[in-house]
A protein has these predicted regions:
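Conserved hydrophobic "DFG−1" position in protein kinase catalytic cores
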Residues: 6, 37, 46, 108-109, ...
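A glycine-rich, hydrophobic loop/mini-helix early in the fold
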Residues: 32-63
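The catalytic Nudix box helix
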Residues: 45-46, 58-92
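Short helix-to-loop capping/linker segments positioned immediately adjacent to catalytic or ligand/cofactor-binding
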Residues: 11, 92-97, 117-118
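Acidic pyrophosphate-coordinating catalytic loop
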Residues: 23-28, 95-106
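Polybasic "coupling" helices that flank or enter modular domains
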Residues: 85, 92-95, 106-110
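Acidic, metal-coordinating catalytic segment for phosphate/diphosphate chemistry
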Residues: 1-34, 40, 49
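Nudix hydrolase/Nudix homology domain
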Residues: 52-56, 66, 99-158
Length: 158
């Protein structure tokens, strides 16, 4: 069972944990960390979630576990979902926003990646590809991208 950290409306850690999926109290929040990977051609690595996860497009990211820091969550998710190892100091914090219950903390990673060498976690990711900003905006406009990921992309990268 995964346990998540609980935060107040000011994103202050309440030093409380909750099982993933359990109901939070009013004014309690969890953290989700997202990373947008951009290559030297200005294209972003976008993944398509597995059929079990809705077959939507997204960036890489996930829930921040209890006791885990944000960069640790990003490096863990990159390893789990893509088989990609990165150093936490390669990640640039772009900002945070509250979307309902979760806070989304968004990071940027400049890195040239050979997608053929990625090891995709099939339970989470069906495919990956590099896309331009206009291609990503088209996915968002056509409701093909996970909503929170689309909002994050437009806020920090458009």
């Amino acid at each position: 069972m995964e346990y998540l950290g609980v935060y107040d409306e000011n994103k202050i850690n309440l030093d409380k944990k909750i099982a993933r999926g359990d109901k939070l109290l009013d004014n309690e929040h969890i953290l989700i960390a997202l990373v947008f990977i951009e290559n030297s051609d200005g294209l972003f690595l976008i993944q398509k979630t597995s059929v079990e996860k809705g077959s939507k497009y997204s960036s890489t990211g996930g829930h921040v576990l209890y006791g885990e820091d944000l960069k640790g969550a990003i490096t863990r998710e990159l390893q789990e979902e893509l088989g990609l190892d990165v150093l936490s100091d390669e990640l640039k914090f772009m900002g945070s926003m509250l979307l309902g219950i979760p806070f989304f903390d968004v990071y940027h990673l400049n890195k040239d990646i050979d997608v053929s060498k990625l090891n995709l976690q099939k339970e989470e990711v069906s495919e990956v590809s590099f896309m331009s900003k206009s291609e990503i905006n088209e996915l968002i406009d056509n409701d093909l991208m996970i909503k929170s990921h689309g909002i994050s992309f437009r806020k920090f990268f458009n």
